[in-house]
UniProtKB/Swiss-Prot annotation:
Belongs to the NXF family. Residues 2-117 are annotated as: RNA-binding (RBD). Signal peptide: none annotated. The modification 3'-nitrotyrosine is found at residue 125. The lineage of its organism: Eukaryota, Metazoa, Chordata, Craniata, Vertebrata. One of its GO terms (cellular component) is cytoplasmic stress granule. Residues 1-113 are annotated as: Disordered. LRR repeats lie at residues 265-290, 291-314, 315-342, 343-370. Keywords: Acetylation, Cytoplasm, Leucine-rich repeat, Methylation, mRNA transport, Nitration, Nuclear pore complex, Nucleus, Protein transport, Repeat, RNA-binding, Translocation, Transport. It comes from Mus musculus. This is Nuclear RNA export factor 1. The minimal CTE binding domain consists of an RNP-type RNA binding domain (RBD) and leucine-rich repeats. Gene3D superfamilies: 3.10.450.50, 3.30.70.330, DNA helicase RuvA subunit, C-terminal domain (1.10.8.10), Ribonuclease Inhibitor (3.80.10.10). It is found in: Nucleus, Nucleoplasm; Nucleus speckle; Cytoplasm; Nucleus, Nuclear pore complex.
Amino acid sequence: MADEGKSYNEHDDRVSFPQRRKKGRGPFRWKCGEGNRRSGRGGSGVQSSRFEEDDGDVAMNDPQDGPRVRYNPYTNRPNRRGDGWHDRDRIHITVRRDRAPAERGGAGTSQDGTTKNWFKITIPYGRKYDKTWLLSMIQSKCSVPFNPIEFHYENTRAHFFVEDATTASALKGVNHKIQDRENRRISIIINASAPPYTVQNELKPEQIEQLKLIMSKRYDGNQQALDLKGLRSDPDLVAQNIDVVLNRRSCMAATLRIIEENIPELLSLNLSSNRLYKLDDMSSIVQKAPNLKTLNLSGNELKTERELDKIKGLKLEELWLDRNPMCDNFGDQSSYISAIRERFPKLLRLDGHELPPPISFDVEAPTMLPPCKGSYFGTENLKSLVLRFLQQYYVIYDSGDRQGLLYAYHDGACCSLSIPYNPQNPVRKNLAEYVKDSRNVKKLKEPTQRFRLLKHTRLNVVAFLNELPKTQHDVNAFVVDISAQTSTLLCFSVNGVFKEVDGKSRDSLRAFTRTFIAVPASNSGLCIVNDELFVRNASPEEIQRAFAMSAPTPSSSPVPTLSPEQQEMLQAFSTQSGMNLEWSQKCLQDNNWDYTRSAQAFTLLKAKGEIPEVAFMK
């Protein structure tokens, strides 16, 4: 880049982003002509319209207001024709009769040249509902999965867009099916719409490749610092007529995706002078650049310190905020520092000034987690019920044919699987068979994908379980906790280990946590209505302990060949330890019928939580 384009890091030893191995895609290289395969849909190219005149302020057409009215979430707007009829206690789902029919929609063109119909969804009084709750409730009642585009609040309403007539028609079917906590019915108004603004302005794959190249020129590998100051006016972008405005959601998303894929170890980022007036679209940087220590947001349009709440998950040590309107909100320096440190307690420098050391109550000495206390059942009746259920369940689960589990699940049961997600430590190869079905909500942000990976009805649940690797569980080492119980419902979790017995990962040991919600069954047993399974690689300690304590062969009485003295010792040991006769005999035999040694071994193993619950079932 020309000398006049340099800023923030003035040196001549600029390097490209380090080569990184993508997931299954070989090493990363900077290739301008190669399309970005993860870029998603594209939109129009450079905008030579009024959006350039306002230097990147986001505008969006509202189909209710006509094509000339700009979307501005901060202005009060009068009610328009048709809005006044709503009764707050009776809300309906309606398609406006003075607009285009829902089946026709507003036309838009995708990158591949196909035409798409767009619809704007409006929820009157939607502002009083949490976004996650509102979308999940609509999705639960909608007959097809949908992807809400550009969800936002405007005055008292909530809005989002969908991109096809089938989805719009399905949303019409949600009429009178959702009620809030005050038993008010929630309506959905559907209008044909032009494509949402951010979709129109998505960068094309070739533009993303150019942006990637320019970001590589602005990256200092020695300092792990990326300088995106005044990115829109970058000479190379201007020369190629590419308009990258970081206060547009599509541009910020493309930029953060490039960072995530190529330099997630980034330590310093300069976003000064980019006309940023909100940080909603930047919130994912917490996951995409978790090591970030220095952030420069100076010379932007941030009006309130509350915008920083969107990124307060960053462990920042240095932050620049000068020349933002928010700086004028504070009467003195101490209140300014206090407000910022409330969001970033480890901050050492603000606007270039050293801060006094943060007050910390962190315990420097290493602390040990308390030892596991073993299972908790509440009552002996519940203990007997749950242990009997688990023994029957895992006999079938480990048999190789899990079809028999159909009788363990309710007709409307649901089930999900998840595996660990850590951006700094990607899933290792030996968990590959679980990746495609993992519903880890820390990784999956799209409601559509979350919905798809939730298995509904007992037929689908058991079909899904049949596809998982064949297993052998260490039932004797299960730790069971009952967390909730009513007369009609029981919630309990199971922790343990299992071994895969076939396939590429044969003999691999896994640890798992499984949470069951069950209701009473007609046979005095349990019927599962909800099943959540979490699988991870077993730790070295878990591998060492696994299958170490095999269950003795059950019998109703002591072995007949025992001497009278041994039988008397066995009865006494069973009474004092609380274990049944089979496990008491095993303990005595393992210690050569030395009563004192047996008692000491029992006390030690019980303190470590290594005696299974079945040992106490009589």
